């Protein structure tokens, strides 16, 4: 069990500068040890550029809706935005056995002067039998300032019947507020 309350999760290394004009978002790996060490259980088996969890968003830029305030407060809100949220707590638990793995990741951001922190939760279950691994990953994010919740449920499998043949796939269902999205990778 790894837990941290009101941690200083400052970035330990800076990111390389990348100029990206494509429609695909540039993925930066998380370099904060709490979120990068022993995080393999939360990775899903799929083709490249598929990440169900992006821990870099935890402690990222706060959501603001300055229009909710009166004129003077709106100016204060606009002029006092911060670039990153403090994290009140983060908890990660993982248990890996011979045939079943389980993990939980939760984090809650601190409230700022003109913003409420976001909440992030994820659970992972993975089982192995012979040449087959099957897993489930569920995530939930609450962003109260913009009145938005997001849920992702995914099932993944990895089948290795021989040293030269490997099949893997991923089914994903997402729900952002009341809008559904689906994904499949094989």
What kind of region is each of these model predictions?
Residues 1, 99-104, 129-136, 163-169:
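Repeated loop/turn-to-beta-strand initiation elements of outer-membrane beta-barrel proteins
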Residues 9-83, 88-90, 95, 106:
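Residues that cap or anchor secondary-structure elements
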Residues 127-133, 144-145, 158-167, 176-178, ...:
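Secondary-structure transition/capping motifs at alpha-helix termini
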């Amino acid at each position: 069990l790894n837990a941290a309350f009101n941690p200083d999760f400052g970035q330990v290394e800076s990111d390389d500068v990348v100029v990206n004009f494509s429609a695909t978002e540039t993925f930066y790996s998380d370099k904060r040890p709490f979120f990068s060490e022993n995080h393999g259980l939360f990775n899903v088996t799929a083709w490249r550029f598929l990440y169900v969890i992006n821990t870099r968003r935890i402690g990222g830029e706060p959501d603001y809706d300055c229009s909710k305030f009166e004129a003077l407060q709106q100016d204060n809100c606009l002029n006092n935005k911060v670039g990153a949220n403090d994290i009140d707590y983060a908890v990660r638990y993982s248990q890996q056995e011979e045939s079943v793995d389980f993990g939980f990741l939760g984090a809650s951001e601190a409230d700022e002067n003109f913003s409420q922190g976001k909440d992030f939760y994820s659970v992972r279950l993975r089982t192995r039998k012979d040449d087959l691994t099957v897993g489930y990953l569920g995530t939930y994010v609450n962003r109260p300032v913009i009145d938005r919740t997001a849920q992702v449920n995914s099932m993944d499998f990895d089948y290795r019947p021989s040293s030269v043949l490997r099949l893997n796939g991923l089914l994903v269902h997402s729900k952002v507020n009341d809008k559904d999205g689906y994904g499949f990778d094989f």
